[in-house]
Design a protein with these regions (language model features):
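Active-site substrate-recognition segment that forms the wall
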Residues: 1-119
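C-terminal lid/capping helical subdomain adjacent to the catalytic/cofactor pocket in oxidative enzymes
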Residues: 114-164
Length: 164
């Protein structure tokens, strides 16, 4: 994750990664949202979950920290209130907003593979906002690498030793 460069440094490796902070607001009451949506103009994801609705968005590059910026949270709420009729984000839900850190590389591609310096180390990090989506494919590639099989795709663009 976002701490990968700190771990890599202990092994003499340099990974160009930084933490990209995303925010989420979980709405505990009923909402008019029935289907997941991405509000493209504001880049806010709206996801009905079991028992609540999640609003999520932003990509804040501010280092490894969990400081919640109220203006970011309110912007996410405003986006949903603008798109959905009779939609209001209750103040208590706003104050319970959380954030998470996503590992982001300069070119937006994850690092997948073995660095030249360590033949017994396989890296799979830097997936940014696509970690869960890319997890199964990355897992398959890591299994192929670990078992010594040829990988099912060319990993050159994802190589851990690439430089920017």
């Amino acid at each position: 994750g976002s701490w990968s460069p700190l771990l890599a440094k202990k092994l003499g490796l340099r990974l160009s990664l930084q933490a990209g902070k995303g925010y989420r607001i979980d709405l505990k009451g009923q909402t008019p949202v029935r289907l997941p949506a991405v509000l493209m103009e504001t880049k806010v994801a709206v996801t009905p979950m079991e028992g609540f609705t999640r609003l999520a968005g932003t990509m804040e590059l501010s280092g490894i920290n969990h400081h919640i910026r109220e203006n970011r949270v309110r912007a996410i709420a405003r986006a949903a209130e603008t798109y959905y009729e009779d939609f209001q984000v209750p103040e208590p839900d706003l104050t319970q907003a959380k954030c998470g850190l996503r590992p982001v590389s300069p070119d937006g591609l994850p690092y997948i593979g073995r660095p030249a310096k360590w033949e017994n180390l396989t890296l799979a990090t830097g997936h940014a906002m696509m970690g869960w989506s890319m997890g199964p494919a990355t897992g398959k590639l890591v299994a192929e690498i670990a078992s010594g099989k040829p990988t099912s795709m060319d990993l050159t663009p994802f190589h851990p030793d690439r430089r920017f």
